[in-house]
Amino acid sequence: MITTVQEISKWRNLCFIRMQSRKWYPVLKKTPLVADGRKIIKHADKVPHPEEIIHPFYQPTAIEQFTACATEYNPSLLDGKKIAPSLIKHPVSLKTILVDSKLKFDDIRGVNKWLMEFVARRQHQRNIVLTPASKSVRSFHVLHLSSTDIAKLRGLENILSEIENTNDLQSRVESVNNELQNIFDRDSKQTRLFCENILAYLIKNYGNSTEKLILLINVTEMQLYSRLDQMKAMNIILYNILCKVEANENPPYSPTLVTALENLLAAINNRFFPGRCENSLHPIVIEQLLSYFIKTGNLNESKNFLGHLIKKGILPEATIINRYLEAIDVHFDKSTKIFDIRSKFAFIADLAPIIENYGTIDLFKFLIPMCRHFDELCSLLNIIRKSNNAKRAVDSTLPIFIKKVLTFTKDPMINSGNLSTVFNIVSPIYGQNVPSEFVEKFILSFALQGNYTMMAHMIDTYKIKLSHKYQLQIIRALKNSERNHALKNTGAVGYNKEFKKYFIEKYLNCTEREALRP
């Protein structure tokens, strides 16, 4: 029994939580808490609230929901495995952390309510309507400068013409800033010239080199606390700067240019907002910034701007989304490690409405390797099945789905059942006439499971021609099955020696039969 203050202090010191930060989100390192020789249940084992789950496409089917509601003890989704990416509060620091959670309940109480909230949230994401940003640049048109106005800018043009490198940029920035002030001092009463129009004109006509563009970005930053006092003006300037960045350079961008532009964005935030300025930026400018940060490999900012576009009901261009996914793959080196998949989910959590309603083939191909449970794979396949380009998407992704099915378990009977489920989901898309090239892939996958019954059924139903080459592929798959599942299911219907003998005699030529003889 613990009786003294010292003993209590000693006991408390046995309990500890360590934090580890990597990549984007801080992550809870799940070190067991020890007290009185017993392990305390880890906080991450609690079923998260539906709002805390960031999985962008998993949707439990009606059967999964019924099973969870009808199971009295430890009902679960996804077999109760720790694969549901969630943002939860750390139990001690109260900071938001990224963890893989179990969707495993202690008992049946509250499961139905939890499911209703989770499904309602998914339905809300499904109902979000996104529209492409208007490509009208009318908002960014600058006031036409007359020849008289342009003549007033001659001093600025002369300074810009003399710049050759970045070594003397600071002094040139001061010179341009002073000349700007002189222009406004000389013409303060009747001028129609505004600072944003002058800078936009200079960026458009003289920002063709990195050095001059950096100078004009720095001048813009200096003018933030004098004549650039509205976000409308900053939209005009940022639009022209980002157009020039896009036109002038291919990634990787000059580090000096990247620093100058990001310093300007930080200064805009400090000048106009306590936090971030996205709410007052034009959607076209936000999309430009998204594209820019993707190209610079800044995934954190890319995610911020992408999420903001979606929240504003804007559908980013498909090419931008594809580049974002490529940047994620590059950052994580197409890793399938548990931690990296969890982190990748954090970067695509905002894409739920796009996956549901505007998914592209490239997006679906990106998502398939991220599935860690067959039910996730089925959720994704059902989204594709309901999409407007279902047939074209299935044509491009079905071989990847078939291959992925066999990665969740080594049990041949479970794999066979999962293969049959996938086949039943996609076959209506083809009006039950599944192309023979896909049927053949299913047959080979069933061969890898040693399932002679399903192989024979599909060969007969779809009248598959067994060429010499294809028979050899089947034989190799069956041999692999015998090696991998030598002690499993040998007596099960469809897998036993009688079915093997029947299949060999009916479907394989004499020369091929010998290869499978004991």
UniProtKB/Swiss-Prot annotation:
InterPro entries: Aep1. It is found in: Mitochondrion. GO terms for molecular function: translation regulator activity. Disulfide bonds: none annotated. One of its GO terms (cellular component) is mitochondrion. One of its GO terms (biological process) is regulation of translation. It holds the Pfam family AEP1. Residues 1-19 form a transit peptide. It comes from the Eukaryota. The keyword Mitochondrion applies. The keyword Transport does not apply. Keywords: Mitochondrion, Transit peptide, Translation regulation. Belongs to the AEP1 family. Present with 504 molecules/cell in log phase SD medium. Required for translation of the mitochondrial OLI1 transcript encoding subunit 9 of mitochondrial ATP synthase. This is ATPase expression protein 1, mitochondrial.
